[in-house]
Amino acid sequence: VDKFQFHVPITLNFKATGRGNINDKVLEIIRNNGIKHVIGIDRGERHLLYLSLIDLKGNIIKQMTLNDIVNEYRGHTYATNYKDLLAEREDNRTEARRNWKKIDNIKEIKQGYLAQVVHIISKMMVEYKAIVILEDLNMGFMRGRQKIERSVYEQFEKSLIEKLNYYVDKQKDEEEVGGLLHALQLTSKFKSFKELGKQSGCLFYVPAWNTSKIDPVTGFVNLFDTKYVNVEKARAFFSNFDAIRYNAEKDWFEFAFNYSNFTDKAKDTREKWTLCTHGTSIRTFRNPSKLNQWDSEEVVLTDKFKKVFEKAGIDICGNLKNAICALKEKAHLEKLMQLMKLLLQMRNSKPNTEVDYMISPVADEQGNFYDSRCGNSALPDNADANGAYNIARKG
């Protein structure tokens, strides 16, 4: 049967002024208190994407992983874990290449995932009158991630911008604001990532520096260099602390310091802190007994410090700072520097497991230490959630 195809170009909203860049308009809305919430999105290590919705006072309204997409159809609920699905497909493709078999396509799964994630975020933006904050990751990061099949990062940004460029809520009447005949433009026209800058309408970019490693309660972040170089530099490191003492009542060691004695990076911010060897940290290492594979162990920090001091012949109830600075043996000082690194390591993960948590070495005003495992819904409940939360707060 002969067929004729008649292609007709359609211009949407042809009466509009054609404003491609709406950045100034969005900034004006923000100045006039038109924005009520902020959405932070973290491209996490354990999650494809993690979302944190906060109000303008920094309170968490909602936090959720975007690994799992839940849909309802005819009264039934269907959940799909796209992280596991993509990982499984990657393994199958690797095996197929190795055995010269047909390689399954992964592109459709990625596109399906992106479409659903973009729908969730755009709907939330309109519902909560929110702007979206993303990490400003360099192009090298994106290209590096593309070596992995789960690299949904660059495609996600582009899809979100294009979706928000002409947003229609199909659940609304066509005459309502946001309906078919009154679509919303929430981003500027996408040209390229190089031209994107720090803003595209209601989409903003903030520096990616340490967002997942900032204590969400106290704001503490590790600015130390704890790499062991030699005896002299290790002694100089400990000499910069204001005080190093053992708290017998709490059974932990305290390291009081002023960041100005170590670095200029904390200038114009809070500089006086006290580190406490509270709780445990996870040490990750190559295990010779397991063919040099990655392994991990949980370290009780206070106990480890006590053992080092005991071997060095140091009385923990005495002047610890002077005693440490008087040490001459590499073995003791190197071990102390390694323990300092663990003390400052707020993100703790075990390879090839779901163990991934945040614990702070700094107490808040009530004497409590942030621990993401405590189940406090008012705080981030895992390391990637903490990243999304701090990204939103930076916005």
Residue ranges and their predicted role:
Residues 1-395:
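Positively charged, helix-rich recognition surfaces that bind polyanionic ligands
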